[in-house]
Amino acid sequence: MLKNKSVVSIDDVQNDDLFEIFDLSESMLKTIESKGNAPLLTNKIMATLFYEPSTRTRLSFESAMHRLGGSVITVSDTKTSSAAKGETLADTVRMASSYSDIIVIRHPLEGAARLASRFTSKPIINAGDGSGQHPTQTILDLFTIKKELGSIDGKVITMVGDLRYGRTIHSLIIALSRFDVKVNLVSPEILRLPEYVYSMLPDRNYVKEYNDLEEVIGETDVLYVTRIQKERFSDQNEYQSVIGSYSINSETVEKMKKKSVIMHPLPRVDEISPDVDNMPQAAYFRQAYYGVPVRMALIYKILGD
């Protein structure tokens, strides 16, 4: 049960809750498209604390809360908040919790959301902590796979790009261990999946590593593409050595199954060519669209009756 619980890691969401969120997300999507809003949380307030830039995640959380009839108070620029004066994360969270019923936080330091949860009894939702995890994106990604392809089990998921710093990758590969899937990892050597993420998997048998996307593109059901995380590199020469390592274009997509999808947590830089956008496999804008109903479902599971 997620009632009044924090979601800091994808491990905080058990399978029963996950499938309930999927069903509720479908209902929320239908409500949005027919009525616009589902005023189920009219007396609730969400605080959003974003210490890192965000467009889709912040807007989708705020839209989700508004569509549920709730209110939002936000800090989207820490330069204009007391954090600029040296206020600790703990004190900011304590203050935000006194003004709200739930807190959504994004922070550049891995583990910040878990730390924040120690200083409040209010639910904390992790909207991304450095190169750690991004659990709500993972719920959205799993929902997208299920909605687009009918099921998650039996699929081949190929992840390509920045597997070292990409927190969406880390959360998703952990969650996929619950399903009957095969996962292909394609990246430059220096952007391989970190060993600590491997250590969180029950086994490695469903995961294989490759350097060449051509080896696995034909068997792929879900091509999950990520940008190279420039902001995570301490050595910009290292970044320059890997930028543009993989670029998905229409020729790449022609080698994929007809019934397959390309996903991306966005924003993209140059890893997916615009000539892919109108191809039937391109699901990344639909994926972003599903973000609001999925987050509505999660928020309601936490705060609803």
Swiss-Prot record:
Database matches in Pfam families: OTCace, OTCace_N
Catalytic function, reaction form: carbamoyl phosphate + L-aspartate = N-carbamoyl-L-aspartate + phosphate + H(+)
Gene3D superfamilies the record matches: Aspartate/ornithine carbamoyltransferase (3.40.50.1370)
GO biological process, one term: 'de novo' pyrimidine nucleobase biosynthetic process
This protein's pathway: Pyrimidine metabolism; UMP biosynthesis via de novo pathway; (S)-dihydroorotate from bicarbonate: step 2/3
EC nos: 2.1.3.2
Residues annotated to bind carbamoyl phosphate: 56-57, 106, 134, 137, 266-267
Annotated residues for binding of L-aspartate: 85, 167, 227
HAMAP family: Asp_carb_tr
Function as written in the Swiss-Prot or TrEMBL entry: Catalyzes the condensation of carbamoyl phosphate and aspartate to form carbamoyl aspartate and inorganic phosphate, the committed step in the de novo pyrimidine nucleotide biosynthesis pathway.
Family designation: Belongs to the aspartate/ornithine carbamoyltransferase superfamily. ATCase family.
Designated name of the protein: Aspartate carbamoyltransferase catalytic subunit
Gene it is expressed from: pyrB
